[in-house]
UniProtKB/Swiss-Prot annotation:
Mn(2+) binds at E8, D10, D19, H24. SUPFAM superfamilies: Concanavalin A-like lectins/glucanases (SSF49899). Pfam families: Lectin_legB. Hemagglutinating activity stable up to incubation at 80 degrees Celsius for 1 hour but diminishes with higher temperatures and is absent at 100 degrees Celsius. Optimum pH is 7-9 with activity decreasing quickly at higher or lower pH. This is Concanavalin V. Ca(2+) binds at D10, Y12, N14, D19. PROSITE patterns: LECTIN_LEGUME_ALPHA, LECTIN_LEGUME_BETA. GO terms for biological process: vasodilation. Keywords: Calcium, Hemagglutinin, Lectin, Manganese, Mannose-binding, Metal-binding, Vasoactive, Vasodilator.
Length: 237
């Protein structure tokens, strides 16, 4: 199975798999059962921003999800990613719908990683920014139902021609270049990611959510991972 570390923006509480009974953000380490969650007031139809940071000195993964009106949620979890992830990874965004549905629209996405090594005092860095997404976005690997180019956005899950979200959909977008996320001689490994998103649903219960994830470089969508599994995990263990 793939090795996945993710920050989930979970719009639908699946209490049967350990979700709290409200929309939340969470940190997932190799399982959809979050290690840590925080309550999140998801604003239907409003553009939000997610900011994720990690630093190997503090060994802490943190995320803040906010809206322009100042409403925000914060979650952090202490983890040494050297012990969890392979040295080379890919970073991506994933989303799913199930019985209930929502649009999982990404308007922008940026990422920076730095690796400072002892031996050479050099810093290896990878940086990318998407302020919009074109129809033929060559530097993204699109999986499942993900598409780019509609209004310059990335749609992670299926949307009909009139803009209505579709159920039982899953899609992911990964940056094409592998990221050197850690190495044994590194003094500091750090990264930060930011994306802006729009979740819109005609349902009283939007579902299921968006995640920023880091995975082994050959990761693909597990079969049956629509709905509560967010396109990331093969099961709810």
């Amino acid at each position: 199975a793939d090795t996945i570390v993710a920050v989930e923006l979970d719009t639908y509480p699946n209490t049967d798999i350990g979700d709290p009974s409200y929309p939340h953000i969470g940190i997932d380490i190799k399982s959809v059962r979050s290690k840590k969650t925080a309550k999140w007031n998801m604003q239907n139809g409003k553009v939000g921003t997610a900011h994720i940071i990690y630093n190997s000195v503090g060994k802490r993964l943190s995320a803040v999800v906010s809206y322009p009106n100042g409403d925000s949620a914060t979650v952090s979890y202490d983890v040494d990613l050297d012990n969890v992830l392979p040295e080379w990874v890919r970073v991506g965004l994933s989303a799913s719908t199930g019985l209930y549905k929502e649009t999982n629209t990404i308007l922008s996405w940026s990422f920076t990683s730095k690796l400072k090594s002892n031996s050479t005092h050099e810093t290896n860095a990878l940086h990318f920014v998407f302020n919009q997404f074109s129809k033929d976005q060559k530097d993204l690997i699109l999986q499942g139902d993900a598409t780019t180019g509609t209004d310059g956005n990335l749609e992670l899950t299926r949307v009909s021609s009139n803009g209505s979200p579709q159920g039982s959909s899953v899609g992911r977008a990964l940056f094409y270049a592998p990221v050197h996320i850690w190495e044994s001689s590194a003094v500091v490994a750090s990264f930060d990611a930011t994306f802006t998103f729009l979740i819109k649903s005609p349902d009283s219960h939007p579902a299921d959510g968006i995640a920023f994830f880091i995975s082994n470089i050959d990761s693909s969508i597990p079969s049956g991972s629509t709905g509560r599994l967010l396109g990331l995990f093969p099961d709810a263990n």
